[in-house]
Amino acid sequence: MRMIRTLATGLFLALSASPSIAATPVASVRVAFDRNGIVDTQASGLADVAAGRAASADDPVRIASISKLVTAIGAMRLVEQGKLDLDADLSSLLGWRLRHPAYPDTPITLRLLLSHRAGLTDAAGYYAVPLDGALSDITDDPRAWDDQHAPGTFFRYANVNFPIVASAMERATGERFDKLMQRLVFAPLKVDACFNWESCRAETAGRAVVQYGASGTPVYDDHHGRKPDCAVIRSTKRDCDLSQWKPGRNGAMFSPQGGLRISANGLARIGRMLLNEGVLDDVRLLWPASVRALTTPQWTYSADNGLTVEEDSSGQSRSGFFCRYGLAVQTLATKREGCRDDPFGDGIERVGHAGAAYGLLSGLWIDRASGTGVVYFATGVEDAPRGTHSAFTEVEERLARGTR
């Protein structure tokens, strides 16, 4: 039986009144589902404080790093079609040399990028490439590479991997990444979503969930009920002419690493597709072998083979957060010393991805054994306290378990 609970209150207008209130989400949404559909929905708070608009499970939000999982689904569709190869050297496809400067004879492959084992770091940047810029300028910078580890030998979570994946997808098809994802993933699954707003309808953008910093100030997607005038980083000449796009030159343009705008209900449809081995509502998006390829860990933590923490400025990534990782898919509840990757606290293995950016925390997790899953997000929780039993925050632990 589907149950819907909604709460919108003036409490959220006073976010910064005290430290205890500062940890209360401006908006939070949680959707539980199984293979057949949604079984429970909880929504509370405000999607837009200034407008007084209550949050709902149909409101699109910048879902942060869960975007990586969705990007990988699109990439796997191209692998199935023979347009991409998980283990081929990407340099010839990209049209520019992609090599670790300390290990120039080691090819960089799609598999290494999707599993954060290519030897790349975010030290040279990854998202602020202007409309007329080239992603190769980032990878040509020695700071973009981990000089201590050869590709394929070490896990180091890095956002920059995914703009490169998007560039490869564009070169393989000649299509712009955001439009390609509409064709490969969103349209077949009947999901109203987009990367960086450009390919979303105005009506969808009008329901955007605004993201708030610790002080309660809007920090992202505060577009007053409209699509933004420019959905990408402007060119060096400050224009927003998308006709300048060239396949593969700048895969960062539509933020494949974090810029997916999607509702909790839309993300639940993607979770159901994964639970059903690539099928949703009689539409086969992926073959079971592709779903297994995505979800099978390519890396499992040991003392000397990777970092269990994301190197970012959020302050919310803790040691033990990553312990198993596939092709843009994280596996939870690793029973190994040093691992604290179980926000549910029940020891059950789940797969999916977490997200954290601009005051938002999010998660998509499925339990394949029971055929169930959950999607959640919360905004305005930049200062969320540490969790009680995992490397996740207290907010994520509550949303994962469905407790208030």
Predicted regions and their residues:
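Short, glycine/proline-biased beta-turn/loop segments that scaffold the active-site neighborhood
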Residues: L86-P101, A187-L189
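Active-site SXXK
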Residues: R30, N36, P60-L90, F162-E170, ...
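Sec/Tat signal peptide C-region and signal peptidase I cleavage site
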Residues: S18-A22
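Bacterial N-terminal signal peptides
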Residues: A8-S16
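Short, conserved catalytic-motif segment at the N-terminal edge
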Residues: A23-V61, K83, A144
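Short, surface-exposed loop or secondary-structure junction motifs
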Residues: D48, P101-I348
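Short, surface-exposed beta-strand/loop micro-motifs that present aromatic residues
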Residues: G352, L360-S370
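Bacterial N-terminal signal peptides that target proteins for export
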Residues: M1-A8
